[in-house]
UniProtKB/Swiss-Prot annotation:
Interacts with GyrB. InterPro entries: DNA_gyrase_inhibitor_YacG (IPR005584), Znf_NHR/GATA (IPR013088). HAMAP family: DNA_gyrase_inhibitor_YacG (MF_00649). This is DNA gyrase inhibitor YacG. Keywords: Metal-binding, Zinc. Its cofactor is Zn(2+). Belongs to the DNA gyrase inhibitor YacG family. Zn(2+) binds at C9, C12, C28, C32. Residues 48-69 are annotated as: Disordered. Inhibits all the catalytic activities of DNA gyrase by preventing its interaction with DNA. Acts by binding directly to the C-terminal domain of GyrB, which probably disrupts DNA binding by the gyrase. One of its GO terms (molecular function) is DNA topoisomerase type II (double strand cut, ATP-hydrolyzing) inhibitor activity.
Amino acid sequence: MSQPMTVQCPTCDAPVEWSAASPSRPFCSERCKLIDLGAWASEEHAIPVSPDAEDELFSGDLEAPHRGH
């Protein structure tokens, strides 16, 4: 039988077995999972995007709706 894969908890670096027996994976615990969620909510973590990306995404929201008369 093969050894289960082990990963590091992203919050505390504790080893975590990657299996169904570890329901919080990749975190070692629900506490570490909530700490990470809080970091995303307070914008300590962010996905990098180009400065113009947001403008492109929402530029259509600023345009007046077209009316077909």
